[in-house]
Amino acid sequence: MGFLFTSESVNEGHPDKLADQISDGILDACLEQDPDSKVACETATKTNMVMVFGEITTKAKVDYEAVVRQVCRDVGFISNETGLDGNNCRVLVELHDQSPDIGQGVHGMGTKSLEEIGAGDQGHMFGYATDETPELMPLTHVLATKLGHRLTVVRKDGTCPWVLPDGKTQVTIEYENEGGAMIPKRVHTILISTQHIEGVSNEKIAEDLMNEVIKKVVPEKYLDADTIFHLNPSGRFVIGGPDGDAGLTGRKIIIDTYGGWGAHGGGAFSGKDPTKVDRSGAYIARQVAKSIVAAGLARRALFQISYAIGVAQPLSIHVDTYGSGKIPDSEILEKVKEKFDFRAGMIGKSLDLKRGGNKRYQTTAAYGHFGRDDTDVFTWEKVVPL
């Protein structure tokens, strides 16, 4: 019997996503000059204001205000009409050194080797993969994410000049469960809410969203006469970005990962250097799950890993293939143990996570951290043979 499942996404102009990108833009700037930077950078934004705050220990010389303004411009916040004027808004900076109590426990204030470096905090992280898409990601999440990205493309290339930076998408798909594997049958509902300029008609909005966004993204085989479309259902979305809603780093963790599939340990990614296992642990967990499915060992896989602050080795690892495995989960776990080094410091080395700059981490902060094509940036998307 079929069932419905829904995933949502938000654009890079959503205030929470702007905050994520600013935090990761600052991480990039620090790592580019000093790969051993310790960064825990949060961002908050509201009307005409951006604040960055947290703990950073680095040898890098970074103009934090300049980074904030450049990220705002990159997204498209260039005037009050867009929701934030990145050139003239207030920028508040409250960044201080990492606590020495944390530093001595995690990296010995720089004296520990990579093999000895402990996890930056306690926590449990999950990786997920499914064979329902080429990306080995859930189709609900893939389509919601691609619709949001397409909204940004048509805004920036002029195809739909009435589109402004803020926006949200949501996709509901009818699935069937086939021996633990997820089989998408049809798209049940598509919801798009996009910020727009004053004066554009709802009819024009709906027409362009259908022709220039939905039909360019969603495969025709998933659409039918019964598919439901809600296109800017509120009727008006002129006030957006930080002018419409406050934004804060780390509030879109399900959008960042698997759209509600699998599981989530609760830790956000953006603004955190590789010693923070909230990020690095989740990245290698995705690589494990993806490698399991790519190897044909299972059609769907969930991998969990957990850590204690200051301890290099994980406390536990776990594999669940939802009954879709070709061999027992216990045997898959043994294969994983043979191929992966889960020590906190070694994850950063194997995935090249100390490499910042060129907007590497800023790029991860919008449109999902997983299922991305560029494995030079998204190194955790490389499959490890099992």
Swiss-Prot record:
L-methionine binds at residues 55, 98, 245, 276. Pathway: Amino-acid biosynthesis; S-adenosyl-L-methionine biosynthesis; S-adenosyl-L-methionine from L-methionine: step 1/1. Keywords: ATP-binding, Cobalt, Cytoplasm, Magnesium, Metal-binding, Nucleotide-binding, One-carbon metabolism, Potassium, Transferase. GO terms for molecular function: ATP binding; metal ion binding; methionine adenosyltransferase activity. It is an enzyme of class 2 (transferase). Signal peptide: none annotated. It catalyses: L-methionine + ATP + H2O = S-adenosyl-L-methionine + phosphate + diphosphate. The keyword Transmembrane helix does not apply. Binds 2 divalent ions per subunit. The metal ions interact primarily with the substrate. Can utilize magnesium, manganese or cobalt (in vitro). Binds 1 potassium ion per subunit. The potassium ion interacts primarily with the substrate. ATP binds at residues 14, 166-168, 234-237, 245, 251-252, 268, 272, 276. InterPro entries: ADOMET_SYNTHASE_CS, S-AdoMet_synt_C, S-AdoMet_synt_central, S-AdoMet_synt_N, S-AdoMet_synthetase, S-AdoMet_synthetase_sfam. Its main location: cytoplasm. Catalyzes the formation of S-adenosylmethionine from methionine and ATP. The reaction comprises two steps that are both catalyzed by the same enzyme: formation of S-adenosylmethionine (AdoMet) and triphosphate, and subsequent hydrolysis of the triphosphate. Homotetramer. PANTHER family: S-ADENOSYLMETHIONINE SYNTHETASE (PTHR11964). Belongs to the AdoMet synthase family. This is S-adenosylmethionine synthase. It comes from Ostreococcus tauri. The lineage of its organism: Eukaryota, Viridiplantae, Chlorophyta, Mamiellophyceae, Mamiellales.
